[in-house]
């Protein structure tokens, strides 16, 4: 049986190999999203040079092993869409975020980026800005939140949110390592904080424009999973990892357009919220699995079957920050998405509901 020591990386031993000359070659780590909303990746060797997504070769993988294709027609193709510096292997190595495509030239069933990109392009004149707040829980090898008693529970919520000190936060080293890795890679991470439930953390990405939001959030998720791997930890984006009187985990989504960000913009915010109210069920359908466990009307959430909005109200579906209500322009926050929701689906449906669908 594997021990905890056996699964934790040995960075000191690895370091001497990372310094070796690569003889004019680079390692390109191709990253994609599988059928379960998890990241997968594999590496290939390329000639050293500066790459854009268009310069990079397409690749393929066994989709029958990722839930994305049947065994008798298992090839799924990777189309590069974004390139980032690799914080694990260092320069000049790269991370290559990729879309998944079928052999017949159609987007894979789980390629939500493709439709999102079309919506962003069609409505680009509105200059949509997004900022996503990714909550997550760090688990030990027994799937217990780090720092929780093996046969009990920690003290009630209260001291943990933005907490400092032993007994209030755990695994801050993972959080800081992730922050630095995001900055190195060019991910538009804008902050981190400890969350309300012990062992729960949050990082924020944005503001990002259009399709960039989903790309940067997915890359940040990949980096977090890889870093936690080195520390022998698991990252859970379950929207309600622990039942009972504990906060769930969300992916609060902040949104604005150029019309909302200028004087008189509040009327555009209010018009958008009215449209969101009319498609509440459609949004809930793509806002993450298991969200009914989280959206209960308690623990800073609205009820899953009711749409609501309010100023500075964290128990509403949509929150308008108080300072922007006073100014009369700004942005709003959609608090409904679960922590495991796909950012392409969130940002895509926001654009579709507010500005209309696009033809295939």
UniProtKB/Swiss-Prot annotation:
> What's the catalysed reaction?
L-glutamate + NH4(+) + ATP = L-glutamine + ADP + phosphate + H(+)
**Which Enzyme Commission number(s) are on file for it?**
6.3.1.2
> Per its UniProt record, what SUPFAM superfamilies does this chain match?
Glutamine synthetase, N-terminal domain, Glutamine synthetase/guanido kinase
Q: Does the keyword Metal-binding apply?
A: no
Question: Which compartments does it reside in?
Answer: Cytoplasm
Pfam families for this protein = Gln-synt_C, Gln-synt_N
Domain GS beta-grasp: residue ranges:
26-105
Q: Could you give the subunit structure recorded for this chain?
A: Homooctamer.
Name this protein carries in UniProt: Glutamine synthetase
Which source organism?
Colletotrichum gloeosporioides
- Lineage, please? Eukaryota, Fungi, Dikarya, Ascomycota, Pezizomycotina
Report the gene name: GLN1
């Amino acid at each position: 049986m594997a021990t905890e020591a056996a699964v934790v990386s040995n960075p000191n031993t690895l370091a001497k190999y990372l310094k070796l000359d690569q003889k004019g070659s680079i390692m390109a780590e191709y990253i994609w999203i599988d059928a379960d909303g998890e990241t997968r990746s594999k590496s290939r060797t390329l000639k050293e040079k500066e790459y854009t997504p268009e310069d990079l070769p397409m690749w393929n993988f066994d989709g029958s092993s990722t839930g994305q294709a049947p065994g008798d027609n298992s090839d799924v193709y990777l189309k590069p869409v974004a390139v980032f510096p690799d914080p694990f292997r260092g320069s000049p190595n790269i991370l290559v975020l990729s879309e998944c495509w079928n052999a017949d030239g159609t987007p894979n069933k789980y390629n939500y980026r493709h439709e999102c990109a079309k919506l962003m392009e069609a409505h680009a004149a509105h200059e949509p800005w997004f900022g996503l707040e990714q909550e997550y829980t760090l688990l030990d090898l027994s799937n217990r939140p780090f720092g929780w008693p093996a046969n009990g529970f920690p003290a009630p919520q209260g001291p943990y949110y933005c907490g400092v000190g032993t007994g209030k936060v755990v695994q801050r080293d993972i959080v800081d390592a992730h922050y630095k890795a995001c900055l190195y890679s060019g991910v538009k991470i804008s902050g981190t904080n400890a969350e309300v439930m012990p062992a729960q953390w949050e990082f924020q990405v944005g503001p990002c424009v259009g399709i960039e939001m989903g790309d940067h959030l997915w890359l940040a998720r990949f980096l977090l999973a890889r870093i936690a791997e080195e520390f022998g930890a698991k990252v859970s984006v379950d929207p309600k990892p622990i039942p009972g009187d504990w906060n769930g985990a969300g992916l609060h989504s902040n949104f604005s357009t150029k019309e909302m960000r200028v004087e008189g913009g509040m009327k555009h915010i209010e018009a958008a919220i009215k449209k969101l109210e009319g498609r509440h069920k459609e949004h809930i359908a793509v806002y993450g699995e298991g969200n009914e466990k989280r959206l209960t009307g308690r623990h800073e959430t609205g009820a899953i079957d009711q749409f609501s909005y309010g100023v500075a109200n964290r128990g509403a579906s949509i929150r308008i920050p108080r300072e922007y209500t006073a100014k009369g322009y700004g942005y709003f926050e959609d608090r409904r998405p679960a922590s495991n929701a796909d950012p392409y689906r969130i940002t895509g449906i926001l654009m579709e509901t507010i500005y209309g669908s696009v033809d295939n």
